[in-house]
Swiss-Prot record:
Keywords: Cytoplasm, Membrane, Phosphoprotein, Transmembrane, Transmembrane helix. Residues 1-122, 176-195 are cytoplasmic. This is Transmembrane protein 134. GO terms for cellular component: membrane; perinuclear region of cytoplasm.
């Protein structure tokens, strides 16, 4: 049986069918894919392009009067206004302060702007409510352990507190990680989320 059929090799997986006739046909009539080549860019090229684009956008922010701006080595921007040269380093620093403040706000609260979070805001609020109620009940139980009251057991607060805290923490952390795109966390796995 093996003599009548040719052996399969890994090269056979890259052959095109006979219907696919293209410019890459071999003398045997079988088209083959060429070798794969990946183009790598040096890190310094990417960093240089990123730096230039950042400077370009910062210069656009700082240049209200339409003057041509170019980066200075000391971090300022010199602009040429009919032969006069002025350094706008103070405006540059204010611009960077406001953009860094904006970035920190966006990093903190950007996950609330996700479309699935806004669509399922009730589920997200319920998750936070479970978390907070669980914490309040557990802290009440701890308070009763520290200063016992006759006739009231702290277990009455500990048990429901943990029952509310565990799913609350789970959902809040899961939602946050899914928004941030961490591996293994997807909204698909939360059954209460409408996709």
């Amino acid at each position: 049986m093996s003599a009548s059929r040719p052996q399969f090799s890994i090269d056979d997986a890259f052959e095109l069918s006979l219907e696919d006739t293209g410019p890459g046909l071999e003398p045997s009539g079988v088209a083959r894919f060429g070798p794969l080549h990946f183009e790598r860019r040096a890190r310094f090229e990417v960093a240089d392009e990123d730096k230039q684009s950042r400077l370009r956008y910062q210069n656009l922010e700082n240049d209200e009067d339409g003057a041509q701006a170019s980066p200075e080595p000391d971090g300022g921007v010199s602009s040429r206004d009919s032969g006069q040269t002025s350094i706008r380093s103070s405006q540059w620093s204010f611009s960077s302060i406001s953009s860094s403040t904006q970035r920190s706000y966006n990093a903190c609260c950007s996950w609330t702007q996700h479309p699935l979070i806004q669509k399922n805001h009730r589920v997200v609020l319920a998750s936070f409510l479970l978390l907070l109620l669980g914490l309040v009940l557990i802290l009440t139980g701890v308070g009763l352990e520290v200063a016992p009251s006759p006739g009231v057991s702290s277990a009455i607060f500990f048990v429901p507190g943990f029952l509310l805290l565990v799913p609350g923490v789970y959902h809040v952390i899961f939602i946050y990680c899914a928004v941030k795109g961490h591996r293994g966390f997807q909204f698909f796995y939360l059954p209460y989320f409408e996709k």
